[in-house]
């Protein structure tokens, strides 16, 4: 009984202690570190923004594109000089209307045409010493599509009406040449020469040599042979001169004349014999030996 009264009395007594308050937050060095990181983040954001603005200004970024590069409905448009450090893949490259398109390189410019397996089919290489083209066939045509020049493994075709060679030494053909007409420019000489070998001209229907406004000369060191197997050899001219034919001896007692007759030996050799009242060829047969 006394314990119950004591307990009831204790419970009814007013508590002298106040309510407990729990403080929530970051204090001390943690708070200073947080402020430092927030300040550092703001500085980085400002630096990043300044760098972005600087890059946009330097690279000349606009709504249409970047610098000399413009994005249009038809593709990309470059104004001014452009430099590509890596391979460029494009369907079509063209310049502005009225302007030329230039390709510049410190070493060479190579254009490759590839198939589906990335194998090179044709190649064009322009270097400091030569321009090389690789392919099965090479053709040069006019604007209208007429063939001017073509070359492949079997033949080289020149489709122009005239082929002119302006070199001082002319043209050298190590093999045979087949053409319907060989002629020089007007008022120019045409010279066919084989310095160390023979020169042969053949045609199934004949070979015609014509000099319309000048002379024609055939000069050789040893023998000049004119042969017709089934036909004739005609010398058709108002004057025919053989100034260097050998002359037979004449008799001192005979009358010396300035008229000679042409004699033919059995071996076909020609010589001159002083004309007399009769034929004097038999007298000068020593020339035929």
From Swiss-Prot:
Sites where a glycan is attached: 60, 108, 284
Keyword Cytoplasm: yes
Main location: membrane
Locations listed in the record: Cell membrane, Sarcolemma; Cytoplasm, Cytoskeleton
Topology of this chain in the membrane: Single-pass type II membrane protein
Membrane spanning residue stretches: 38-56
Cellular component GO terms held in the UniProt record: cytoskeleton; dystroglycan complex; plasma membrane; sarcoglycan complex; sarcolemma; sarcoplasmic reticulum
UniProt keyword terms in alphabetical order: Cell membrane, Cytoplasm, Cytoskeleton, Disulfide bond, Glycoprotein, Membrane, Signal-anchor, Transmembrane, Transmembrane helix
Ranges in the topological domain labelled Cytoplasmic: 1-37
Tissue localization of expression: Most strongly expressed in skeletal and heart muscle. Also detected in proliferating myoblasts.
Keyword Transmembrane helix: yes
Topological region Extracellular: 57-289
Subunit text: Interacts with FLNC. Cross-link to form 2 major subcomplexes: one consisting of SGCB, SGCD and SGCG and the other consisting of SGCB and SGCD. The association between SGCB and SGCG is particularly strong while SGCA is loosely associated with the other sarcoglycans. Interacts with DAG1.
Annotated function: Component of the sarcoglycan complex, a subcomplex of the dystrophin-glycoprotein complex which forms a link between the F-actin cytoskeleton and the extracellular matrix.
Protein name: Delta-sarcoglycan
Species of the source: Mus musculus
